[in-house]
Amino acid sequence: KKGIANCLKDINNDSRPFSFIALGGSSNGSIFDGHNYTYVGSTWGKIVDILIDKKCMNPIIFIDELDKVSRTEHGKEIIGILTHLIDSTQNDIFQDKYFGNVDLDLSKALFIFSYNDVDLIDKILLDRIHRIKFDNLILEDKIIICEKYLLPELYKNFGIENIIHFDENIIKYLIE
């Protein structure tokens, strides 16, 4: 999922800056919109952090495990913030608590969500998401992805290119 999102290009065929946020176990909205600057040790939220890091206002922000947001009041706060972030009628005035009344225009940012169980996602938020459904991959597709993309990256990261090679039978065994 993340690999597909990371390959998205703009109209000039340029890659847009990409960031990843894992929601699994998140239970507080301040992860996105920060804390008031008057609190000791407070800081801005992840959205502002991404804008600063990527030095742009139109990054791709991949939010993983949307269906894992807690069902508490804090989880509802997260859902409310996410709804605001992707709602085109209001995401041009996002405010991080750390910066007070400073409006940030996120209307050019692209938010991508991944999830496993659509039934666990808030219906109001889901209504604002354009859904693309992927069918489960067959074994042959998984082998191709592993051989062409995953293994070369692992070989490079561990410095074992041209040293170790996984036979297709081993890959098949590991996948099954």
Where are these regions (language model features)?
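Active-site phosphate-binding and catalytic loops of NTP-dependent enzymes
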Residues: 16, 43-46, 90-100, 156-160
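Helical "lid/switch" subdomain of P-loop NTPase nucleotide-binding domains
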Residues: 4, 43-44, 59, 65, ...
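Conserved catalytic/switch belt of AAA+ P-loop NTPases
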Residues: 63-104
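Conserved C-terminal "switch" segment of AAA+ ATPases
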Residues: 14-15, 55, 117-127, 131-176
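Walker A/P-loop
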Residues: 1-22, 52-53, 83, 87
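AAA+/P-loop NTPase substrate/partner-engagement loops
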Residues: 10-42, 50, 70, 141
